UniProtKB/Swiss-Prot annotation:
It comes from Mus musculus. Inhibitor of phospholipase A2, also possesses anti-coagulant properties. InterPro entries: Annexin, Annexin_repeat, Annexin_repeat_CS, Annexin_sf, ANX3. Annexin repeats lie at residues 18-89, 90-161, 173-245, 249-320. This is Annexin A3. GO terms for cellular component: collagen-containing extracellular matrix; phagocytic vesicle membrane; plasma membrane; specific granule. The gene is Anxa3. Belongs to the annexin family. The modification N-acetylalanine is found at residue 2.
Amino acid sequence: MASIWVGPRGTIKDYPGFSPSVDAEAIRKAIRGLGTDEKTLINILTERSNAQRQLIVKQYQAAYEQELKDDLKGDLSGHFEHVMVALVTAPALFDAKQLKKSMKGTGTDEDALIEILTTRSSRQMKEISQAYYTVYKKSLGDDISSETSGDFRKALLTLADGRRDESLKVDEHLAKKDAQILYNAGENKWGTDEDKFTEVLCLRSFPQLKLTFDEYRNISQKDIEDSIKGELSGHFEDLLLAIVHCARNTPAFLAERLHQALKGAGTDEFTLNRIMVSRSEIDLLDIRHEFKKHYGYSLYSAIQSDTSGDYRTVLLKICGEDD
């Protein structure tokens, strides 16, 4: 059975001739030797798929009675450590931890919440919610409820529920009906019916939404994005615009997130690490393509000029190559 965490356009694939015991031993030597052998760690962890890394983690635990992630944490530091630990974490658990991190402490990282909840499939969301509950003994929905409010909260909870239709079939009649519902809920009435926007944008499949946006343009002579900007505001507006962007082109949405993370004075490593790791086996090739198309330079060169040391090396290995 194909994993829901693997797509055809990743930069990292299964390693042929893979042996968990050989890799676990090599990693142990790299960590335990005099000084850490970062090169070996990077090469092994970026040249194995996540499924293979999980087998290394099991083998490592069985052979050395140590958690690989704990040994990595003890031996590495900074952003480099964060990426390496992310690489040995199962995808659903990684996303669960990222969601927790975005809601922890003072202030919520709404952009991270939006990015994760809009780009994961319904089946992925169900696994993430399970992982979240297993680790934190609280439901993801409960934490979202206590950290957000209003229409933004309602929409996030709908996405977190993993109820978006996943079928690739489109229904023209439904698209016309939904387009009219959106038009009546916004442009065509005094005041806005936010629930209708949430219902359509959070539950319909992406191919279905694309058709709905075309129908919307026919009815209103406006792009749905312009109506959302005119009718809504705040984080709820940001969330719905993100859904529209993802429905049209998820890799382009994530390329824009990476561009924002890398441009300007500081680097947003939290976002950079999350997207590079979580999309490395799904669609990072497409994200690279969109990045180059929109910004005129490659993602590889952006990472190269914005990061340094082992952290740069591991990100470039995940990225794959220059475009």
